Amino acid sequence: MKKIFKYMIVGLVACTTLSSCLESSLDTNPTDSMSGSGLLANANAALVPLNGLYRSMYSAWSPTDNTHQCFGISAYNLMADVMGEDMIMAAMGSGWFWYDCLYNVKSRYTATTWRSYDLWNCYYTWISNANYILDAEETMAGTETEVNYIMGQAYAIRAYSYFMLAQSFARTYKGHEDEPCCPIYVEPTVAGTEGKPRSTVLETYAQIMNDINKAVERLNGTTRKHISHIDYATALGLQARIALVMEDWATAKKSSEEAIAVSKCTIAKVSEFKGLNSVSAPNVMWGAEIISDQSGMYAGLFTHMDADADKYGAKARKQINKDLYGKMGTEDERLVWWNPKDDNNKDGGYQQEKFKFSDIQTWMGDYVWMRIEEMYLIAAEAECRLGNDAGAREYLMDLMSKRDASYSCAQKSGTSMGKLTSDYTGSLLEEIIIQRRIELWGEFGRIYDIRRLKQGFKRTAEMGWPTDALLVNRNANDPESYMWVLTIPQTEFDGNSSLDQTKDQNPVGDTK
């Protein structure tokens, strides 16, 4: 029996530039509608489907009914942040992201309106788009540099998508290499394409590394046309992220250092990127420039974050773990990212002010997906893991000198980490991770770090967590838990005869 492949190519014939893409442009057509003699005939024409693919990364394009929490990369980063201990949801509000926060989505894998289907469908849609672009390389007209620019981005998008699938539907890489991960497709898929079995974690990461290495190679020497495009520096940043999860410290160091060297971005003072809503800030490596007809309105990041806008963010306030807030010095400029004096804080944590609309009336604000500060934190961690504490401290101080004039990590050393994220050891590695938690709060997806660091965590009322979200009698303290491994959607089992639901489904509960 053949798999009736449901992942679609984004329909973008009418979308010639990022700024002209409208919501209606995101209707999907079957993958075989993209002809090599048409949109992919030459590198210049290929920018149309490529731009549309990026457009879907910040749009409420999801076929599910829960589009207000399904708006691409920023939505999934927010999802992964509320799954940890640092970003507090003070209340259920309208319900968006609340069930992620409570770990109450895995049993809903039969519905197309919940996370399992949403993430699986999203990432495989991006993979399908990338595969169609990559398949056109031999016939695509253009200079070598022009074709490399298209192909390098397609490889990077496929690498990123499989990387996020691996982080969502399998346990972390190290120690789980032989466990099942996800099916791998590297060629265009159409109705009737035979489904693949789940590859192992090791096989999936081998594909990820193969793709991101090719992306880095192909993008080197090209010039980015738009901030939403993955360029050479951004591909290096993605390579560094992947290497961290694989505990390949040498690659993490090399890639992050090269990204710092070639990106032309600089560590920015907090005052230079207020609201985290502009891709024009000097520290932004990759992001989505939002224009008025692409704001997403209620299906957008700032709607969920900016409480002053009196939208979803006011009903379900995002606040920082008080314990983490207390790790900042009195002169730390990042203190302004949270407001402990907000009258609406009540019994929760401290109200976030880090993410703000640039214009509330028009729902405006760009999405930032990678900052240069992350590269310094990766380089610091990699140096520390490699035993070079002096080098690690230097990278950390490069960042912290722009955050807190009185900061010092001179006495920190070593790599010891507590079993729980709240079990502090005082090591240099722990200090780097603490600063990472503060610096990237709301941007990266905290649960991904908790997984790769193999720590458990807890939520307490003292941190500011509401009673309903304390995760009582759950396995959050066990780093080997399946609590944060999503179930595969029922639609995949219904359409893919290579999968056996009795053997291939991930545990619905916290343990296997």
Where are the model-predicted features located?
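Membrane-proximal, proline-rich intrinsically disordered regions
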Residues: C21-L78, L324, M328-G329, Q455-K512
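Short, surface-exposed recognition loops and adjoining beta-strand edges that mediate ligand/DNA contacts
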Residues: T31-S37, T64-G84, A90, R171-D178, ...
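Extended ligand-binding clefts on enzyme/binding-domain cores
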Residues: A43, Y58-T67, E203, M246-E247, ...
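Conserved, well-structured interaction surfaces
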Residues: G93-F169, S199, V216-T222, T362-Y367, ...
